């Protein structure tokens, strides 16, 4: 994800601005009678109300990206014992942060960065790019599902300080199949468990909204005891959502265009892109938030 540089006037406006979400969608995570697919469909329906149609593009196009986000929505993920609220930008579907039951907002970033959330948020201490969350691993290594979402919500809801959640939970997690990997990761990075929980939510919620393929894959295995993962190809496509969106605009003007980097992703034309991607990022304005190149999104979350 490209870096965003805010002007002093933008900083002042954001500091004094309280976020008012356009809608809040509640997902009862442990309710087996409420399918993941219904949750994603409901959120998409509300997001589409703020999208536009673009001639030659099959999918709805998100609002133009802004340096200081103007449009937000919340998703409240509720388990039997706890809940967290995710703050998501409408213009690019990025997860910016989450709120605990105690009313504390945790935001991606660190000291010296500029807050986008109101209500005195705290920094998580790391960014929201996939490079920040999983390093050089592929997204096919991220295990998802109803049980994974439940654990993520319950653990993140207890977050009080920047690096203590991992220290408190790692012993309990030693009984999990990936315990050895978690223990090794926690030893190298005290934030490893928080990052692991967040990347699961980013893929299940944000990428589930962006991608038909992701939402279908997650839905098919959401109730599986062993969880569900993306394919290698799906993971690579997810990390190129911005570029796929740009290609959708190119195909709108030149329907028969051959776009080599799309072919590498298994996307030969706009029909194939529409099968894979549900919502397209707006490319019509040179928003400062987008920066120099759409190809910088290799590890955006």
Curated annotation (Swiss-Prot):
Answer yes or no on keyword Cytoplasm: no
User: GO molecular-function annotation terms?
Assistant: rRNA N-glycosylase activity; toxin activity
Record's catalysed reaction(s): Endohydrolysis of the N-glycosidic bond at one specific adenosine on the 28S rRNA
Location of the active site: 207
Q: Which SUPFAM superfamilies match?
A: Ribosome inactivating proteins (RIP)
Keywords linked to the UniProt accession: Cleavage on pair of basic residues, Hydrolase, Plant defense, Protein synthesis inhibitor, Toxin, Zymogen
Under the heading InterPro entries, the entry gives:
Ribosome-inact_prot_sf (IPR036041), Ribosome_inactivat_1/2 (IPR017989), Ribosome_inactivat_prot (IPR001574), Ribosome_inactivat_prot_CS (IPR017988), Ribosome_inactivat_prot_sub1 (IPR016138), Ribosome_inactivat_prot_sub2 (IPR016139)
What EC number(s) is this enzyme filed under? 3.2.2.22
Which Pfam family would be a valid example here? Answer: RIP
Record GO biological process: defense response; negative regulation of translation
UniProt enzyme class: hydrolase
Q: Which residues form the propeptide?
A: 1-16, 162-186, 258-301
Concerning PANTHER family, the annotation shows: ALBUMIN B-32 (PTHR33453:SF9), PTHR33453
**Similarity annotation:** Belongs to the ribosome-inactivating protein family. Type 1 RIP subfamily.
| Main function | Potent catalytic inactivator of eukaryotic protein synthesis. It may be a component of natural defense mechanisms involved in protecting the kernel against soil-borne fungal infections.
Q: How does it assemble?
A: Synthesized and stored in the kernel as a 34 kDa inactive precursor. During germination, this neutral precursor is converted into a basic, active form by limited proteolysis, which removes 25 AA of net charge -6 from the center of the polypeptide chain. Additional processing also occurs at the N- and C-termini of the polypeptide. A two-chain active RIP (comprised of 16.5 and 8.5 kDa fragments that remain tightly associated) is produced from this processing event.
Q: What is this protein called?
A: Ribosome-inactivating protein
């Amino acid at each position: 994800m490209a870096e965003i540089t805010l002007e002093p006037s933008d900083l002042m406006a954001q500091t004094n601005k309280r976020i008012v979400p356009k809608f809040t969608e509640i997902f009862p995570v442990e309710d087996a009678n409420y399918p993941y697919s219904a949750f994603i469909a409901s959120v998409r329906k509300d997001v589409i109300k703020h999208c536009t149609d673009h001639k030659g593009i099959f999918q709805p196009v998100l609002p133009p990206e802004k340096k200081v986000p103007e449009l937000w929505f919340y998703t409240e993920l509720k388990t039997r014992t706890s809940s967290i609220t995710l703050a998501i930008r409408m213009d690019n579907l990025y997860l910016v942060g989450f709120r605990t039951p105690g009313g504390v907002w945790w935001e991606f970033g660190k000291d010296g960065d500029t807050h986008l959330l109101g209500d005195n948020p705290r920094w998580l201490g790391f960014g929201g790019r996939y490079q920040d969350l999983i390093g050089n691993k592929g997204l096919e290594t991220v295990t998802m599902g109803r049980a994974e979402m439940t654990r993520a919500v319950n653990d993140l809801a207890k977050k009080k300080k920047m690096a203590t959640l991992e220290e408190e939970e790692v012993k309990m997690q030693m009984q999990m199949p990936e315990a050895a990997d978690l223990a090794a990761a926690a030893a190298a990075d005290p934030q490893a468990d928080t990052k692991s929980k967040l990347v699961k939510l980013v893929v299940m919620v944000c990428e589930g909204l962006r991608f038909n393929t992701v939402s279908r894959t997650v839905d098919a295995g959401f109730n599986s005891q062993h969880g569900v993962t993306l394919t290698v190809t799906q993971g690579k496509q997810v990390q190129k959502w911005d570029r796929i969106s740009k290609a959708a605009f190119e195909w709108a003007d030149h329907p028969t265009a051959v776009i080599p980097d799309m072919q590498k992703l298994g996307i030969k034309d706009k029909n194939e892109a529409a099968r894979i991607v549900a919502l397209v990022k707006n490319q019509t304005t040179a928003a400062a938030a987008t920066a120099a190149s759409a190809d910088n999104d290799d590890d955006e979350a």
